[in-house]
């Protein structure tokens, strides 16, 4: 593995290395780019400038005779019908002697797509697959299954239990085979590789697609890659290289000892500003207006995670290319010295080089997201107890490297959103960035520490210092990077067991696979990750001892509530509030948030940012609602999430009073429908069965509307938290956070006064609700 700072010339390194292997007689030589189109074009131009012979067809005689390097993208190498497999039907396998995987971390998303199955809702087999697992899915969550079938909430997802997959693998295979043989089907390219391991795949279902994904990519199917004499991985200086082991099958001992530059400080100059960390009161729209003003003088690139995020820039964007061809054309203009202005790119955190004046201002607006159901579930499962998803940190690191492509380059990086701002100050996430990026983040914080709650205009004046090449800033920026030592490669302690267990299972060695994962569980300290690993253990154990696998899964569920629900019924404790609300609130303000006024404000903003009506983020809404209840000093639960039945959220307000909450934050209808109203009635019944007659549960529906359709009936006395009520509540919580940030939050009498001042006492909450009307 070769680690070079972003912009450090990995492409040239890779081409020269392969040419040297050809000179040694270790051909044929293959260069793999993470994507096609623009990235391939860049590489071919680079090879031409170096005088290195390249072709784009691995069946080309020049490649086969080791006279030229073949350049292909990740999709060409890794797929079920790859020309590099010994199972190739139309011709002999294309051999590989030496291979370079460029920007290996960036190639992973393509690798996952081409070695897993995605069945869109338009497919002929979409409904039959759901029908096949109907009863198994109901056991996980009948409500989520109904949401998926009706397509009401795009964020609804379900995972098929592994024991059901084992039991019905042959029937599933028969269902999929006819579709997989159709050229043009989404199953056509990956099927030959995935069908070999279908019985141990995970299956995640949403209203848009069914994702069928092996525990690790089955790269053994790509025979020539597995048999290559030399495999070189080119990566940026990211802090976690575990995925090279789990996904590419790289040797952990090689990954742990990468070839690196003499210093990690050979990166370009970056001032990295998170305005909302400096002043949490600054809004995203205020920052966007200031960025738009900068773009009149400097080429500016904004990277957003999704199309809805892109729409926030519609009023400011000069260009918003979406296709590869459009992106190539815009980037070419920017590189030619033309002032293009403000360019918005969607989900392009890697693969685009923007040196010098092509990009002087780079903006990341929002945390990189997970869009497929499987990606979302894996993010929930593998986020640490701190909430950190290592893959997001890697994508941020890749993204902020787009604007500096040499150690002489410079760029201002602006981060928008409370989550991004929090990542830059939380020690648990800061350490997951590369040494150079950590140093630049710390320097930028040092420069802005004295600014306090300055308005956005003054914050942006700091950016102008770097852009105008202020001599004091330039000198300080260079000194901060001097002498930074490169890090060794980091491989998590569970990476090798995950890969080795999968490889053993592919060969039928389920006893070995289960033992490897059992040992990995015992070695892990993070409770959430331990639960995820324990579920992986149960998947392999189920193949040889289904009963014991259920016992293992039952423990996993106590450690990580996003794991599967076991066959036997789960229980959930009843909750009650015994302590004074102010006492509990004061205690949790201390334990749930980092110290410092900015950290408190950012913690609240991160939570409030999720408390919005959004069809794509209902899981995040419910998690934030749980957190809000706890922060305000109540007891709070998510019964439906924990045991598969009951309300979405349950708040205990004290003195026997409860809110029984059905959260329909993904609803877009103008009235409350029959099924949503029925769910609220079922949730109320669940509460009455489990709580004493002395307890009162108020049925609360979170919905844009408080009016029922004619065929719908709500429980007697039911209330709605509408958009207006939710906004009033979150506005008051935000004002409360401003006050809390500047007082002694350990003093319950102070917190009690602030709760009362902001109408957040238990007795005040009813004022945010509206009656549900017929």
What name fits each language-model region?
Residues 307-310, 326-334, 338, 364, ...:
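Catalytic core segments in nucleotide and nucleic-acid processing enzymes
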Residues 40-92, 325, 329-334:
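Inter-Walker segment of RecA-like/P-loop motor cores
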Residues 308, 406-534, 743-774:
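Long, largely alpha-helical accessory region at the distal end of helicase-like NTP-driven motors
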Residues 553-556, 562-616:
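Interdomain/boundary linker segments immediately adjacent to catalytic/signaling cores
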Residues 1-5, 95-98, 103-298, 305-313, ...:
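Conserved coupling segment at the C-terminus of the helicase ATP-binding
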Residues 6-55, 76-79, 237-244, 303-310:
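Conserved Walker A/P-loop ATP-binding site and its immediately adjacent core
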